[in-house]
């Protein structure tokens, strides 16, 4: 009997040997697709794989990953609760910033990941993930820790853990934003009937939410 794959598995398979952009020829070891709970209500999206991620084939396994694990725990979450992916699926050489053509090539696959997982809440880590999902050139320090109801999910931008490791003054704001994240999750969680645990039951964004539209208009007006 032929093996049946889920849409997420099909997408991962289609990208296994991806050569759609120049990153495939610039020293990457492998495509780093994503990892976690395929039915997660909460998804985290970073920028791109680093050295350790490229070696192991999973997002956030280096120092930034260890910090992320601590932050998740502070918000009452674990890796098994969430799904983690990056905008860019291949490591840029020397960990440089992604280039626009690379983002444009990879973005459709990120959006397909999000559609397959169907999270209610997406936490974007850093500038690139936030700008890609908001589709606006806006700095993460301006929007971090805020709620953006989009068409299919709620976006919650956060500072990137790697930035906090390189700039120690960002660590406390990052921890504070994870406290806000926990408060938001707690507000929108409901107890499971079979046990004393809680399950995240975040509401879908409301069409025509004028408060969120006004927030975005204020942010992006120039």
Q: Which residues fall in each region the model found?
A:
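A polyanion-binding, active-site-adjacent surface
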Residues: 1-190, 200-203, 211-222
């Amino acid at each position: 009997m032929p093996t049946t794959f889920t849409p997420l598995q099909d997408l991962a398979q289609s990208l296994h040997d991806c050569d759609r952009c120049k990153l495939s020829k610039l020293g990457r070891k492998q495509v780093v697709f994503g990892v976690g709970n395929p039915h997660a209500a909460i998804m985290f999206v970073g920028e791109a794989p680093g050295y350790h991620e490229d070696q192991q084939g999973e997002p956030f396994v280096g120092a930034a990953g260890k910090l992320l694990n601590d932050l998740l725990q502070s918000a009452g979450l674990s890796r098994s609760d969430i799904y983690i992916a990056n905008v860019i699926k291949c490591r840029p050489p020397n960990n440089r910033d992604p280039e626009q053509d690379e983002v444009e090539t990879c973005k459709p696959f990120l959006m397909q990941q999000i559609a397959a997982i169907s999270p209610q809440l997406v936490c974007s880590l850093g500038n690139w993930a936030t700008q890609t999902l908001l589709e606006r050139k806006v700095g993460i320090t301006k929007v971090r820790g805020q709620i953006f109801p989009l068409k299919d999910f709620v976006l919650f931008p956060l500072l990137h853990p790697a930035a906090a490791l390189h700039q120690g003054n960002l660590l406390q704001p990052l921890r504070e934003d994870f406290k806000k994240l926990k408060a938001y999750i707690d507000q929108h969680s409901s107890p499971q009937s079979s046990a004393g645990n809680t399950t995240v039951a975040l509401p879908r964004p409301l069409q025509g939410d004028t408060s969120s539209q006004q927030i975005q208009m204020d942010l992006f007006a120039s």
